[in-house]
């Protein structure tokens, strides 16, 4: 059995590996990685990042975003979000965006991983999963980056906020909102207040 065949025993379809992960099982890691990429066992996603794609009836499946991001960050504390999620809130957003936002504690910047765009944003805190309240707060945090009319979206967010669980929305605003967002929701939850995120 060759060293490359021994190395393959440690690899699992659907997983993403960093160069140092593979180095544990290889004495010539760069040569072995090059061989595995050339024969199609591994796919190079970015510098030092490789995927072992799952075979499906449609061909090779790309790695799941959470596995890809976890390997890239070397950390499992992150939240995958997308501006597309705002569309499900019923606040008048309809645009489709081709990037995924990754809230995390380590990296900041835009990265291309496996042919997909990820916008990494360092945040001091974020929830473990997306909630309606977090999405409303996140939308107001990022309202200037959206293609829709800011005032129309904010008016609908205020209407939607009135129907949310007050405690959960207050918690999300306090923990995840920027200063303007906190002011906006403080006003939005008061009856008859003018709504403005400026």
Predicted regions and their residues:
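Short beta-edge/loop segments at beta->alpha junctions of small alpha/beta modules
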Residues: 1-74
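Charged, low-complexity, helix/coiled-coil-prone segments
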Residues: 22-34, 72-84, 95-100, 123-132, ...
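Short coil/loop linkers at secondary-structure junctions
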Residues: 28-29, 92, 177-179
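A short, charged helix-loop
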Residues: 114-122
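Hydrophobic alpha-helical interaction segments
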Residues: 123-198
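Alpha-helix initiation and N-capping motif
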Residues: 1-4, 30, 65-66, 82, ...
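Basic Lys/Arg-rich amphipathic helical interaction modules
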Residues: 6-9, 113, 170
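Short gly/ser-rich loop at a beta-strand->alpha-helix junction or flexible surface loop bordering the NTP-binding
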Residues: 44-54, 68-114
């Amino acid at each position: 059995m060759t060293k490359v065949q021994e190395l393959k025993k440690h690899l699992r379809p659907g997983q993403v590996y960093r160069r140092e992960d593979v180095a544990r099982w290889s004495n010539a890691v760069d040569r072995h990685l090059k061989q595995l990429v050339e024969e199609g066992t591994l796919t190079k996603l970015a510098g030092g990042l490789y995927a072992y794609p799952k075979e499906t009836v449609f061909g090779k499946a790309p790695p799941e975003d959470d596995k890809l991001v976890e390997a890239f960050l070397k950390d499992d504390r992150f939240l995958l979000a997308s501006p597309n999620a705002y569309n499900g809130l019923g606040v008048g957003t309809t645009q489709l965006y081709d990037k995924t936002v990754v809230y995390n504690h380590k990296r900041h910047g835009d990265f291309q991983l496996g042919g997909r765009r990820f916008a990494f944003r360092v945040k001091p805190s974020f929830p473990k999963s997306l909630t309606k309240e977090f999405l409303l707060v996140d939308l107001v945090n990022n309202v200037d980056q959206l293609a829709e009319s800011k005032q129309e979206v904010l008016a609908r967010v205020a209407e939607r906020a009135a129907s949310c669980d007050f405690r959960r929305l207050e918690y999300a605003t306090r923990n995840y909102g920027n200063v303007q967002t906190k002011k906006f929701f403080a006003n939005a939850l008061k009856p008859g207040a003018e709504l403005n995120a400026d």
